[in-house]
Amino acid sequence: MKKFITLSVLPILASSSIRLLGKMMNVGTVGGEKVDMFTRNQKPIIIAFWHGRQVMMPLAYRGTAASILISQHRDGEIIATIMKKFGFCAIRGSSSRGGIPALRKLVSAGRQGQDLVITPDGPRGPARQIQMGVLSLAKLTGFPIVPLTFASSKKKVFSSWDRFQIPLPWAKGLFVWGDPIWVTSTQKKDDLLQQGVF
């Protein structure tokens, strides 16, 4: 019964709450035209956002099909089910568990024309520090990385490793899309940090 509630009832409540929260907030978007250009030309991208900002991200997606990398940990199963409620394909794996098979599945999904979604600092951090997964994915696919973030005027910030944030109703929110980042075969994660793109 507990597993049924966790994997069936909770994702429905969570996805409905996210949609309702989006309607209760005054949400704007900056830089969306950068993503729309790729969508119009049917060119897949890699969408990257920090782990602690993921709550509202399903509402930001502007494409037609996307696969998202989610860890194989217990909470990852819940998140995967929630993401499916928004139409995302969940691919399970992380740098610490199931990473290589997950990377192959992401590359395969990209070759089928899907956008790819990843948290560069997930699933365990350190917070807001890029791990090698997103760079490897960009090098293997040739897709640009498009940074995405969300800011809210009022929010609850938890004391978790990622400083997880949940926006509050009636707050002002803003999705911000960054410029596409094309990764070369020799590029390192420190290069991206020095450029200030994350």
Task: Locate each region found by the language model.
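Membrane-anchoring hydrophobic helices of lipid-metabolizing enzymes
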Residues: 1-56, 62-63, 170-172, 194-197
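Membrane-interfacial amphipathic helices and adjacent loop/beta segments
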Residues: 8-30, 70-111
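Catalytic core of membrane glycerolipid acyltransferases/transacylases, capturing the structured
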Residues: 44-97, 141, 157
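Short gly/pro/ser/thr-enriched loop/turn and capping motifs at secondary-structure boundaries
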Residues: 75-77, 99, 124-127, 152-156
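Generic beta-sheet signal
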Residues: 93, 119, 147-148
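Catalytic-site beta-strand/loop segments enriched in glycine and acidic/polar residues
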Residues: 105-137, 141
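A cross-family acyltransferase "interaction/gating" segment
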Residues: 129-189
